[in-house]
Regions:
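Conserved hydrophobic/aromatic beta-strand scaffold that supports enzyme active sites
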Residues: 10, 20, 85-89, 107
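Active-site-adjacent beta-strand/loop module that shapes the phosphate/pyrophosphate-binding cleft
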Residues: 13, 72-96, 124-129, 133
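Conserved Nudix-box catalytic region and its N-terminal flanking loop in Nudix hydrolases
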Residues: 17-53, 146, 151-155
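A short coil-to-beta-strand element that immediately follows conserved catalytic motifs
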Residues: 62-70
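NUDIX/MutT-family hydrolases
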Residues: 87, 98-129, 148-153
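Charged phosphate-binding loop/patch that engages nucleotide di/tri-phosphates or the phosphate backbone
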Residues: 129-155
């Protein structure tokens, strides 16, 4: 079974705002909407190093003091593949904010983000980012995403 590793990072500034990326749809990946920066783990790269690299590429910021928040696990029964997205958060960063080919980036309050056009399933990703008793979400392609609590119970 093929497994793909990815990452996503929630960055919070001193005013409590989060760095949001308005991801643009692409023919190879139609996933779009408000989300956090992140991407794929390259061969031979650690997950943490991939977060630092992806955030820098997509936002211009260099992050540090990353805290692991949990992960999202997707299963595709047609392709017999799985996809893991490791979630991190931090409030430690430096650099100048810049947009990238992935989308525009801007600081927003969580309420502003939630009122916007979220990327698919982003509300469930946020639950894992923000709740220590929900370390995982699990989904089957085309069937949605379920939260998983510390006892392995789907919610």
């Amino acid at each position: 079974m093929e497994t793909e590793l990815c990452n996503m990072c929630m960055i919070t500034d001193a005013e409590g705002r989060v760095l949001v990326q308005e991801r643009l749809p692409k023919p190879s990946n139609p996933w779009s909407g408000l989300t956090f920066p992140g991407g794929h783990v390259e061969p031979g790269e650690t997950v943490v190093a991939s977060v630092i690299r992806e955030v820098q590429e997509e936002t211009g910021l260099t992050v540090s003091n990353l805290q692991n928040c949990g992960y999202i696990q997707w299963y595709n029964p047609v392709k017999q593949s799985q996809y893991f997205v490791f979630l991190f958060k931090t409030n430690t960063f430096s650099g100048e904010l810049k947009d990238s080919v992935e989308g525009k980036v801007k600081w927003m309050t969580l309420d502003e983000m939630l009122a916007g056009s979220l990327a698919p399933n982003m509300i469930k990703y946020l639950a894992v980012f923000q709740n220590e008793t929900i370390p995982q979400a699990y989904g089957i392609s085309g069937q949605g995403l379920n939260l998983v609590d510390n006892n392995g119970i789907l919610q």
